[in-house]
Amino acid sequence: EPTPLHDTPPTVFFEVTKPIEVPKTKPCSQLILQHDFAYTYGQAPVFANYTPPSDCPSQTFSTIVLEWKATCRRRQFDRIFGVWLGGVEILRSCTAEPRPNGIVWTVEKDITRYYSLLKSNQTLAVYLGNLIDKTYTGIYHVNISLHFYPAKEKLNSFQQKLDNLASGYHSWADLILPISRNLPLNDGLWFEVQNSNDTELKEFKIPQNAYRAVLEVYVSFHENDEFWYSNLPNEYIAANNLSGTPGNGPFREVVVSLDGEVVGAVWPFTVIFTGGINPLLWRPITAIGSFDLPTYDIEITPFLGKILDGKSHKFGFNVTNALNVWYVDANLHLWLDKQSTKTEGKLSKHSSLPLVVSLVSDFKGLNGTFLTRTSRSVSSTGWVKSSYGNITTRSIQDFYYSNSMVLGKDGNMQIVNQKIIFNDSVYINLPSSYVHSLTSHKTFPLYLYTDFLGQGNGTYLLITNVDLGFIEKKSGLGFSNSSLRNLRSAEGNMVVKNNLVVSGLESTQQIYRYDGGKFCYFRNISSSNYTILYDKVGSKCNKKSLSNLDFVLSRLWPFGARMNFAGLRFT
């Protein structure tokens, strides 16, 4: 006898990532918000008052964790959402798509870098634009909690000690300014970039005793640009008289300006949301970055000399080749000289060369091949004089992009092979003539294949293969070097009728490896049709096992000539 639906336990959805390193101390926990998100689209964010924990035995914390826990049942689209504290965004995420029996998922994020913000009373704002109608009836039931882990006594003096310069580069910022939209809003606090000519601006003013500044950028892409990496060149669209087909080609970048001058860029990781391409591929293991979208840091320190005048200045956000819509905002992290009321500085060198673009098209009718290549470099050098002495900072961003696209079967089959290389380097020349460095080398490979087979009566079969990777190496500033290789391969098919999935099959494998020197984490997991086939987890930094894993990874990636899609999205 079949089990009644209401007796079936909800399915647990999750994103594969390393656990947060927390001390063995017992955390002080607070439930900040409990809310049911029903019809919330176009309405004001949900608000809650945040007060720092007062009943903890220690008021010095080594780690602070935000926990988002949600449940939902029946049918609903994936929904993008954001969490802001005092206008500062602390989480960008996507909901999971529910099942009739219900789902539950948890997102945990280390938010210790927002420590200074969490020391005072703030307003928490959450925007999750959900729609309810006769078909889509799922309500998201959400709890948001904060967990404060007291530092061990041995760490207290180090955590609080900001009287030496190096600590300013190891610790969190003294002040964080929101570079987001001001309330009240019937939307999220993010800026909405609608097209390539749209530059969103935010005015700000900083204290005159800052000696370091970092801009943390949040970005997500939606509607006509949700699948920007598969968008077609305009010449192909025009030649074939296509309408309603997203264009402007497959390259996008977020360009950040300060008072009209380019200070950096973001070439974003290709996050695939839980309803993206083929929703079945992301159940119950969601795509890389979908539950906790990555953020991107741009070193602003070389430009401090331009904004330490006590006057208002403007950050601008523009997206190259953008279609509607991109959600972008940022947080300006500032380190302040506690021994001085005024620092001074100067930008001594700055170079931001125009974007280099190469597009080669070869098509006949609806079939063809396209190769897009781009590169960009942004570098800046500046000094700041504070009570620590004269510090010179040099920041370099180098970007490389390649996208190979094939269209066949009269445009019903699409293959995309894309790679983004995103390198950041920061060099800090201290008064002692010692040079600190911070480097991050990221590689984002993507392979997509889709084949659309019409079957009449509003029904079609969609065959998909997706290979996705997030690879990063970090080093510098006294921290142990770290490396991350997060690789996902998925394939499946689904039958869609009147824009609703009626059946389908999927299988997926993901290999996650993080090596932080003292802390390591490895996970090899596979699923098929909601069932976990195997799940192998390890946490030892074993060089021999890592070398064996490299062999496994080399066989898994890069994938052979496989197969993308034409911007289809269903639930």
Curated annotation (Swiss-Prot):
Is highly glycosylated and is largly resistant against self-deglycosylation. It comes from the Eukaryota. Glycans are attached at residues 121, 143, 197, 241, 318, 367, 390, 423, 457, 481, 524, 529. PANTHER family: PEPTIDE-N4-(N-ACETYL-BETA-GLUCOSAMINYL)ASPARAGINE AMIDASE A PROTEIN. This is Peptide-N4-(N-acetyl-beta-glucosaminyl)asparagine amidase A. Its EC number is 3.5.1.52. It holds the Pfam family PNGaseA. InterPro entries: PNGase_A (IPR021102), PNGaseA_N (IPR056948).
